[in-house]
């Protein structure tokens, strides 16, 4: 987010939000009561083997997602902490579809004029990049070389048993952004089911400041096979420092993105899952799913 009225040197901080469990440097968004206690016992399988297996499965998931259409509904609000009401809003509904040639594209379904300038900010290109891509973070053999991945332990989310990993970029290349945070990987399906962290770095160059809140993304199984994103939420207090005589300003921001109506697009490409051809419609979701929270009003 960029400040709409003044340019300032900025520092990011997480908004104080009630949490059932404590936060740390790798879980900037609070965890609800669905997250059980962490088991720090070393895994029976070497962590390197788990990482290799789940990143390979993430590549399969990423490729499968490219064969689905879905609807994305994004809402970005500024919150007046005195009244607890929304002071500005960006809202857009898009269908992620395929054009007649089979190329992936997006169609705007509904996009009223943004009122975020009422709250003192405006959307930046990296905000759109987060909504369209980064909140659906995947860790595959292609990009894992950019990250340090540390095994933390095992944890149950609702009824789903998960491996827990902390992820951070090894180095920051200019003009690139990276995920830093924690991921939960289903111990059976070996796919990421929850992501909690930031996209880093923020731009702190005077005159180009661009802040973003931490975020959390939940996935659920679609047609019994893949854990696709269904809900992302980001929330934080953006602290803008004074400059050129202007007063300091804090902006409370909340972002909610929903992903719905997944449908497999007709394709001649064979999609393999666990060595089996599942290109045709597979079974409906079964088993346990971690529950995403309901959006705040």
Regions found by a protein language model. Give the residues of each.
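Positively charged n-region of N-terminal signal peptides that target proteins for export
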Residues: 1-4
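Bacterial N-terminal signal peptides
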Residues: 7-16
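Sec/Tat signal peptide C-region and signal peptidase I cleavage site
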Residues: 18-22
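Structured extracytoplasmic
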Residues: 23-180, 187-194, 198-213, 221-224, ...
């Amino acid at each position: 987010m960029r400040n709409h009225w003044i340019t300032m040197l900025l520092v990011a901080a997480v908004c104080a939000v009630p949490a059932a469990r404590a936060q740390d440097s790798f879980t900037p968004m609070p965890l609800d009561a669905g997250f059980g206690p962490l088991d720090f016992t070393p895994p029976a399988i070497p962590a390197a083997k788990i990482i290799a297996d789940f990143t390979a499965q993430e590549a399969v998931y990423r490729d499968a997602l490219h064969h689905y259409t879905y609807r994305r509904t994004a809402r970005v609000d500024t919150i007046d902490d005195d009244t607890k009401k929304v002071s500005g809003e960006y809202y857009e509904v898009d269908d992620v579809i395929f054009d007649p040639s089979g190329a992936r594209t997006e169609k705007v379904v509904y996009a009223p004029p943004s009122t975020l300038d009422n709250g003192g900010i405006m959307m930046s290109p990296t905000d759109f990049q987060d909504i369209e891509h980064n909140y659906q973070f995947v860790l595959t053999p292609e990009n894992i070389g950019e990250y340090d991945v540390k095994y933390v332990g095992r944890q149950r989310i609702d009824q789903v048993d998960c491996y827990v990993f902390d992820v951070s970029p090894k180095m920051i290349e200019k003009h690139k952004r990276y995920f830093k945070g924690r991921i939960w990987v289903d111990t059976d399906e070996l796919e990421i089911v929850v992501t909690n962290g930031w996209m880093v770095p923020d731009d702190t160059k005077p005159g180009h400041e661009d802040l973003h809140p931490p975020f959390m993304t939940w996935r659920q199984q679609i047609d019994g096979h893949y854990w696709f994103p269904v809900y992302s939420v980001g929330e934080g207090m953006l602290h803008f420092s004074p400059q050129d005589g202007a007063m300091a300003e804090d902006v409370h921001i909340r972002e909610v993105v929903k992903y719905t109506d997944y449908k497999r697009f007709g394709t001649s490409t064979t999609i393999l899952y666990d060595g089996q051809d599942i290109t045709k419609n597979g079974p409906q979701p079964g088993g346990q799913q971690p529950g995403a929270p309901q959006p705040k009003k």
